[in-house]
């Protein structure tokens, strides 16, 4: 019974992210993070390695099919528009408003959030929540391939020469290009879904602790944290609920709404962390603050927006049954 309870907690993204943030903040503010052992270079390498393993495993569950742009162009365009363009607007505007202040370095983290693709877990969440799984799978592959160009472009456009672009391109190829290739080698390997979910959540826990636990929050005025919180709330809660209200009003069914909301509001913070730790460490202040809000957003989606009762009611109204 206890092992079942433990597995339930380990497979809960909301619980593991919340636990990771609590442990990371306690470690940070209590001065317990072993920074003398886990220096910046080692943290960067560990973050990149962990993320490569995570993305390789998660992408190996995504089939390379239904990718014909002539047949599925509308679906691909929707994923690109919502998952890349719309999802990037608020953090980019936030950075532009802050780039000429004394906290420009910390605000640079918003650029990495903007450049980051949506989370790889959009597909499994779409399956669980009766979203459009085919669209989620297709969109994930397309977005991650385009991210090989999109991430360097956005970072170059916003941060220019302040970032080593050659190192950025190499890091992006390591983070996303390598998993895209390696994942095909594992595509036919049978992996227990619960064990995979628990392992990926443990990786997320480690990455959040490693990055947030080491982030230097001291010396920053209270108002900059408030600004980062507001930007994060608008980017997750604001965009997510806006997509829900807009699409429901124009008659789009539950399945498409679920996946569209996830693509728009649920960023892959692991990629943002890995890039920022490797290229622009001061920007971790903005990312750490954003993670705290995104954890709350995940819990809200799980318990309210995509609750089982609401899902059953919506699908019943659309003439579908919940098995």
What kind of region is each of these model predictions?
Residues 1-323:
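Alpha-helical transmembrane segments of multi-pass small-molecule/ion transporters
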């Amino acid at each position: 019974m206890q092992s079942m309870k433990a597995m339930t907690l380990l497979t809960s993204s909301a619980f593991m992210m919340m636990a990771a943030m609590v442990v990371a903040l306690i470690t940070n503010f209590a001065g317990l993070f072993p920074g003398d052992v886990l220096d910046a270079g080692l943290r960067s390498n560990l973050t990149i390695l962990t993320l490569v393993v995570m993305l390789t495993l998660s992408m190996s569950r995504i089939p390379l099919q239904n990718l014909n742009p002539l047949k599925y162009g509308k679906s691909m365009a929707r994923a690109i528009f919502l998952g890349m363009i719309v999802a990037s607007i608020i953090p980019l505007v936030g950075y532009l408003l802050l780039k000429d202040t004394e906290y420009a370095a910390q605000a640079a983290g918003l650029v990495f959030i903007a450049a980051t693709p949506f989370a790889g877990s959009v597909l499994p969440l779409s399956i669980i929540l009766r979203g459009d799984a085919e669209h989620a799978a297709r969109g994930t592959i397309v977005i991650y391939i385009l991210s090989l160009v999109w991430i360097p472009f956005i970072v170059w456009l916003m941060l220019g020469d302040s970032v080593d672009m050659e190192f950025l391109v190499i890091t992006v190829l390591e983070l996303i290009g390598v998993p895209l290739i390696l994942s095909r080698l594992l595509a036919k390997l049978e992996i227990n879904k619960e064990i995979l979910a628990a392992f990926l959540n443990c990786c997320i826990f480690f990455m959040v602790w490693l990055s947030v636990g080491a982030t230097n929050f001291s010396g920053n005025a209270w108002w900059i944290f408030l600004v980062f919180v507001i930007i994060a709330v608008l980017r997750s809660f604001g965009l997510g609920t806006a997509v829900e209200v807009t699409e429901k009003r124009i008659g789009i069914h539950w399945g498409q709404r679920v996946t569209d909301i996830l693509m728009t509001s649920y960023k892959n913070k692991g990629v943002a962390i890995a890039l920022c730790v490797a290229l622009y460490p001061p920007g971790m202040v903005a990312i750490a603050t954003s993670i705290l809000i995104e954890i709350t957003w995940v819990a809200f989606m799980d318990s309210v927006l995509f609750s089982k009762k609401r899902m059953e009611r919506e699908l019943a109204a659309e003439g579908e049954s919940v098995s």
